[in-house]
Structure formats: structure tokens, C-alpha cells
Amino acid sequence: MDFKRLTAFFAIALVIMIGWEKMFPTPKPVPAPQQAAQQQAVTASAEAALAPATPITVTTDTVQAVIDEKSGDLRRLTLLKYKATGDENKPFILFGDGKEYTYVAQSELLDAQGNNILKGIGFSAPKKQYSLEGDKVEVRLSAPETRGLKIDKVYTFTKGSYLVNVRFDIANGSGQTANLSADYRIVRDHSEPEGQGYFTHSYVGPVVYTPEGNFQKVSFSDLDDDAKSGKSEAEYIRKTPTGWLGMIEHHFMSTWILQPKGRQSVCAAGECNIDIKRRNDKLYSTSVSVPLAAIQNGAKAEASINLYAGPQTTSVIANIADNLQLAKDYGKVHWFASPLFWLLNQLHNIIGNWGWAIIVLTIIVKAVLYPLTNASYRSMAKMRAAAPKLQAIKEKYGDDRMAQQQAMMQLYTDEKINPLGGCLPMLLQIPVFIGLYWALFASVELRQAPWLGWITDLSRADPYYILPIIMAATMFAQTYLNPPPTDPMQAKMMKIMPLVFSVMFFFFPAGLVLYWVVNNLLTIAQQWHINRSIEKQRAQGEVVS
């Protein structure tokens, strides 16, 4: 396998890693036709306006939350243990409703006609500042009696957790049975989070999981296309007995959990209605309407649901709800990237440093693939040793391409060289490269994780470009060990490609570049050893197999 094919292999792998989602976007989900009636009922609910908020601040060891006292919306959520992408001196803000972007969590109670019974009513709280005391802190917002119903909205925050419980306490004094449903939604705009780039772009938008439809992304662009086609509101609607839904972005997520692991679904009184749409105000909403059991006059009831708003930490989210780890965006290679990250995580648990864990993982992957890559590199080494003879054939036959090809094929037969012998093993490595790319790129566990010296965050680009420069040097070394091309254009490509790849990797997370550098160093050692072995055999007059 010559350098041209090797370069093509890396180029194809890189294009697939970066552009797979763009080349093969997730198919747009189609609403079930029998749910048209439910669609009208769900969309009839008034969309809560994002009016100026009267803030209630809640501080725990993991988050600082701002709740609007009037609407009861969760308007701002700061993750105190994570630094902002653009400014490491500030904490990371997940929810917000400022000038920069809109991203909030809302909840309402709806009547049988889908009307928000709390619209225009307003809550009140006994104080404006709450902090963690013990393991939990509870914020109770009380609304004036409406329709004979006394309603409180209660937020419960837990120490060491990114789970927020949202509960409605309802007392029915209306003189009649109350038939209600609780509507929970996450609303955001289309703004890109900080850190998004062409080489480091990840999915941002709605996601949903149900047993019937499995995991699906419902992209902003799909919702926009529906809106442009003439619909007043583009929607994705489904009925489900369980599941979860919300919004994801690189490393972080916010999801309503319909059935916590090992517990009863909130949809026990009837199937929940999921609704994902672009609203009339051009904000995007993922919501679920949860039917409540009929509340008799004089009775009390509650509607409770968990909101997970935090990092996509695999070990955490896997224990919150079934298949919640699917929200960790490994693109279309989840089946392969997930076990690779599992192995990387096990190594980290032993070593204690993500950078060294990446190095050990690279060595393990290289060892597993050794039987395949060894055949490829032996083929390249034999081609390298036969390069003078190939050059002589080219000079002898000049422009007679037919005679030149026949002479080369005879040389391959005499030297026991299969010019394509190394292609298949190299192609089989493509899934490994792609899987590792996504495993490293998508994992919040590597965010702000140091390696050594100047590498203080493996999820961000090398600030001094040292690793990309080392990578370029290793690629130049590989070109020296590869068969020298007889074509002048290929020779130029050999000199240019290391520089091109190095510049591209300036923008890649340091963890990815570290993997590539170590892999290149191991490849150089393997190729050098094989070259020496074949040259020694040729010098001794042995037949090289």
C-alpha cells in the first residue's frame, strides 16, 4: 500500500469523522397520523411568555438556579463545577434568558381543554434566597386560589446532584371533580453554544426517547423546514407510556424524565403526549403533557417529575433513566464509540489521569490491531525495498504504460509483493479511528481534564500547538519509512499532507491529537522494525514472505 493510498485512507477517515452527521443527517421523524386530535389539544395550551422575571436564587454545591417568582419558570441554571467555555474564570451557564440566548424550563397545569389554568395568576414565595441545608433544599411557590383549586409549585434540589424535582401540590375545593394534566417543557432558541467550530461541531437541539420510537434527534432545521412549508407551527407529536425528552448540546443536556430507573412512570394515569415544535415566537420547545388522575372535590393530589439539567456524565445519566446515556452524542457510531469510552473510563479509574489513559488506550488498540496492521506494513516495507527496481522499470519503458504495467506485475510476482495486500487491514481500522474520535470528542469527562504541563484541558485545542507540530513531525517520519513514490505529484503530496493535517489538527481537542501522536509514534516504531527486518533478510539473500 503506497503513500497515496495511505493518505487517502486518513483523508476519508477524517472526512467521515467530521462530516458524517452532515452527509447523512438523522431522518426526520414522522408524527403518527392517528394522533391529530391529540395534536390540537396539546398545541391549544398557551405558550408562556418570557416576560421580565422576579428572581428567586437557589444555591447548592453543584448549581445556582434562578426561578421566576411570578411564572415559576426555571430561568437560569449555572453549573458551579464547570468552567465557561469562553472564559475559564466564570462558571458554565446552561439555562439563561438574557440577550445572548434563551434556554429555560417551564411547567404548567392544563384543564381538559388544554388551557393553562395558571395563566396570569402568578406565584409568590416566602423569600428570595435559598441555599443548601443538609442534603436538600425546597422552594415552594404558592398561587392564589383559582377555579377553586389551591396550587403550589415546589422545586427540590439535592446535594451533589443535577436532578431537580418539580412538583405541583393541588388541593381541590372547587365543588366538582378536577380533570387536569401537567405540562412540562424546555424552551430554547437556535443560538450555537460557545466552542462550536467546523472541526469541533456537535449536535444542538431536541432529543426524545420512547420505547416505540427509540432514540431520535429532531433537528432545528427539520422544524424550520416544516414551518417554512406553510404550517403555523411545525410539530412532532407522540403518545408514550414512558421515556424522556429534552435538549442536548456538546457535553451538556436538559431532559424531563418520565420514568426514573426502578420507579413508576409519571404516565401511570394515562399515556403522556410528547410535543416538539418551533413555536410562533420562533423559539423551539420540547414538552410533555402528563394526564393526572381525576381529583375529587375535597381531595389533594400531586404531579411530580424529575428534570436532569447538567453534564452528560455516562456513569451518572445511565443510572437516572433507561437509555438516557444515548443522549451523549456519539454521532452514528454510538455502537462502537460507547464501548471504547467504557474501556477508556476503566483505564482512567486505574491510572487517575485522562491523558495517560488515552495513551494506554492507544497502545491497547494498536496491540489488538497488530495482526492486521502488520500485514499492511510488511507490504509497504517490501514495496519500499523494491522501489529502485520500480524506478528502473519506469525509466526503461518511459511512456509505454502497457509494457510498464506488465513489468511491474512481473516484479510483484518475483518479489512476492501484493500491491493491494495492505489495503483491507487499513480500511478495517476506519471504524476504530471514527469510534475513538467520537468517544474522545463527545465525553464531558475529558472537559477541563489536564494531562501534563501546558495541556490543562484535553477537550480543548492545544494552546501552544505543540502536539499538532509533533504530529506533523511524526507524519514526516512516516513518509520517510514508506515506499518512495515514483510519481512527482505523489512526491509533492508526501511533503504537503503532513502540513495540511497538522494545521487541521490545530483546532482539534488536545485529547484527540494526543491519541493521533501516540498512534503515529507506535506506527513509526512498527514500520521501522519491519523495514529493518526485511532489509536484513534481503541482505542475507533470504526470500521475504
Curated annotation (Swiss-Prot):
It is found in: Cell inner membrane. It comes from the Bacteria. GO terms for cellular component: plasma membrane. GO terms for biological process: protein insertion into membrane; protein transport. It holds the Pfam family YidC_periplas. The keyword Transport applies. It is a multi-pass membrane protein. The keyword Membrane applies. The chain crosses the membrane at residues 350-370, 424-444, 461-481, 498-518. Keywords: Cell inner membrane, Cell membrane, Chaperone, Membrane, Protein transport, Transmembrane, Transmembrane helix, Transport. GO terms for molecular function: membrane insertase activity. Its main location: membrane. Interacts with the Sec translocase complex via SecD. Specifically interacts with transmembrane segments of nascent integral membrane proteins during membrane integration. Belongs to the OXA1/ALB3/YidC family. Type 1 subfamily. NCBIfam families: PRK01318.1-3, yidC_nterm, yidC_oxa1_cterm. Required for the insertion and/or proper folding and/or complex formation of integral membrane proteins into the membrane. Involved in integration of membrane proteins that insert both dependently and independently of the Sec translocase complex, as well as at least some lipoproteins. Aids folding of multispanning membrane proteins. This is Membrane protein insertase YidC. It comes from Neisseria meningitidis serogroup B (strain ATCC BAA-335 / MC58).
